[in-house]
């Protein structure tokens, strides 16, 4: 049996129903939360969520405030490479990746 919990919730989603449920879980279990999105979900062009990195972060912070989630909350990014731009030439795809990295950081 595990005597000490050494892991924390970490999710890679842009679904705000899932994010809300995860924040509530972390809140009531007094855990930090790590949230990531992929470059397909959120990027400088909006991704398939139509959210840019700063918009995604803002929506997360608004949600956290709404449900009074005051635990440690980390926002990360997953797969910042050129995959969403695989149909572009290599140089343009890499430039898009670099721009996304800068927008996220």
Regions picked out by a protein language model, each given a short descriptive name:
Residues 1-74, 84, 93:
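Alpha/beta catalytic barrel-like cores
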Residues 81-105:
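Helix-rich catalytic cores of soluble enzyme domains
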């Amino acid at each position: 049996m595990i005597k000490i919990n050494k892991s924390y919730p970490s999710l890679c989603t842009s679904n705000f129903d899932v994010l809300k449920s995860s924040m509530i879980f972390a809140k009531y279990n007094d855990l930090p939360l790590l949230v990531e999105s992929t470059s397909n979900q959120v990027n400088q062009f909006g991704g398939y969520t139509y959210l840019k990195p700063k918009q995604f972060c803002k929506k997360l912070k608004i949600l956290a405030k709404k449900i009074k989630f005051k635990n440690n909350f980390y926002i990360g990014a997953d797969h910042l490479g050129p995959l969403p731009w695989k149909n572009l030439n290599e140089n343009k795809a890499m430039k898009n990746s670099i721009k996304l990295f800068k927008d996220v950081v």
